[in-house]
Structures are given as C-alpha cells and as structure tokens.
Amino acid sequence: MEIKYLDHFNIKASKGQLSEVRDFYIDVLGFKVGFRPKLSGPGQWLYAGSNAMVHLSEDENRTSRKAEDFLDHIAMRCVGVNEFAKKLDEYSIQFRPAYIPEIDLTQLFFKDPAGVTIELNFKGEKLSE
C-alpha cells in the first residue's frame, strides 16, 4: 500500500468567493476549467493537464470560515520558478521564497483569495535575483 501523489483538494465557499478563487487558480496558476460530473451541488473542477486537481464547491454557509483554521497549506510540484515569480509580481501577490540546499528545492509561498497557503516546489531550479 502506498500513496502516489496528491489527487485533488476541495475548496468550499460562497458563490461570490468561489468566483474569485476560481479566477485566481486560472489566471495566476494556469489551471483550466474542465469536466465535472453531476454532483449534488454546484461547483467546478480545475485541471492541471488531465488531472482535476482543484475541486470548487459552492456552500453559502461558508462565508466566514477561515481556511487556515483547518488546512495549513497545499503543495504542488512545478517547473519554471522565475516565470511563476514574475506572474505573482504581475498580480501584486506577495510571496515568500525559500531554498532547501540539501534537496536542491526552491519554494514559493503565498495565499489564495480564500486564505489557503499555496506552496510551489521547484526541484533543481533557483530563483533569479
């Protein structure tokens, strides 16, 4: 028995919040809206390639819930650290870079509009100064 990789994560929020969250994941991180089967409530699935990685679910009772109370962060393996850093700057998104020399890993940390911390990991890449 083994876990292979992160399958998906779900963000539940009000309709208005979900619109902002959806746009963030599409515009800033490059996800695409894709197929979502008929489920009990409204929502969307966002894809990275052929993987439905971000599930968005509408729940009008979630207007004041703080994501950081339950979810610390979401990490994704990526390529193109400098391109991502430039895009975050273009959107005026503050981020904290980190580098772990023992495993040659550069990381970018920032928050999405729902308050969820996003960690982007870049193996073998360094952030330009």
Model-derived segments and their meaning:
Residues S40, F70, D104:
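Exposed loop/turn and edge beta-strand positions of beta-sandwich/beta-sheet ligand-binding modules
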Residues V33-R65, T117-G124:
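Conserved short beta-strand elements that form part of the metal-binding/catalytic scaffold
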Residues M1-K4, E90-E129:
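Vicinal oxygen chelate
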Residues A67-L88:
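Mid-chain, well-packed structural core segment of small domains
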Residues I26-V33, I93-Q94:
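Conserved acetyl-CoA-binding loop of GNAT-fold acetyltransferases
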Residues M1-R22, D72-I74, K126-E129:
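N-terminal beta-strand motif that seeds the catalytic metal site of vicinal oxygen chelate
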